[in-house]
């Protein structure tokens, strides 16, 4: 893959495919995020012409555009921006709220808060928000505070050994916002110990004057 830039090449979704038997039907096993696809034939037999036909892609998301609530009383350009933004959110709505379908596909605690707020105003899919909250709580650190990031595959685990102060501080607020939007008290009770642990963890970074210490042990 020829490219420019400094982003890790592991995030570039390129693929080398060998067609051993032709004609035939082939399906690529990975999930991709793209607007355009470039196909380059590197080598083929001299015994005939090579062609691809019937190419299709299957879109996957837990977001349902039939439930999408468009912005009300806005200009046409604002409505268009809102719809594109909702489509971006939909692409990140998989089994949890991913930080992006083309990047490392992690569930990040800070991204989750923004995505949840956007979901409440558009799709109102409380299930994917709830599952995401349970994931960061289920992969909590030893002190009970929520995970900063979570990988689901190949096995669900805490994806970052260090914590971001802002993200940890947001978790109790996210639980409150979820309750206000969904009315799901049982989930709040389940997450309450993690929310309290998040508060305790944040307070360890605050000095006697109420200011956050620079050497607080948090990442970033």
At which residue positions do the language-model features occur?
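Low-complexity, intrinsically disordered regulatory segments enriched in Pro/Ser/Thr and acidic residues
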Residues: 152-154, 172
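Alpha-helical scaffold segments in carbohydrate-active enzymes
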Residues: 114, 135, 194-205
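Aromatic- and histidine-enriched alpha-helix N-cap/loop-to-helix transition segments
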Residues: 32, 103-113, 124, 162-170, ...
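Extended, hydrophobic alpha-helical segments in both membrane/secreted and soluble proteins
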Residues: 167-178, 191, 195-199
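Extracellular/oxidizing-compartment recognition motifs
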Residues: 1-99, 111, 127-130, 143-152, ...
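Hydrophobic alpha-helical scaffolding
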Residues: 27, 71-75, 105, 119-122, ...
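Alpha-helical support elements that line or immediately flank enzyme active sites
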Residues: 37-42, 110-139, 175-182
């Amino acid at each position: 893959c020829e490219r420019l830039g400094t982003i890790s090449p592991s995030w570039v979704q390129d693929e080398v495919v060998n067609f051993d038997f032709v004609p035939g039907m082939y399906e690529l096993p990975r999930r991709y995020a793209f607007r355009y696809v470039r196909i380059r034939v590197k080598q083929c037999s001299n015994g005939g012409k090579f062609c691809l036909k019937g190419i299709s892609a299957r879109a996957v998301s837990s977001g349902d555009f039939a439930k999408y609530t468009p912005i009300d009383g806005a200009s046409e350009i604002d409505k268009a921006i809102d719809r594109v933004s909702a489509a971006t959110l939909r692409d990140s709505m998989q089994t949890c709220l991913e930080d992006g379908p083309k990047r490392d596909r992690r569930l990040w605690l800070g991204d989750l808060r923004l995505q949840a707020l956007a979901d409440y105003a558009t799709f109102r899919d409380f299930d994917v928000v709830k599952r995401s909250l349970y994931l960061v709580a289920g992969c909590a650190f030893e002190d009970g505070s929520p995970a900063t990031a979570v990988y689901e595959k190949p096995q669900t685990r805490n994806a970052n050994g260090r914590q971001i102060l802002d993200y940890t501080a947001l978790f109790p607020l996210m639980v409150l916002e979820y309750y206000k939007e969904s009315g799901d008290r049982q989930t709040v009770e389940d997450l309450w110990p993690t929310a309290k642990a998040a508060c305790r963890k944040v307070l360890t970074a605050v000095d006697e004057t109420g200011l956050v210490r620079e050497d607080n042990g948090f990442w970033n």
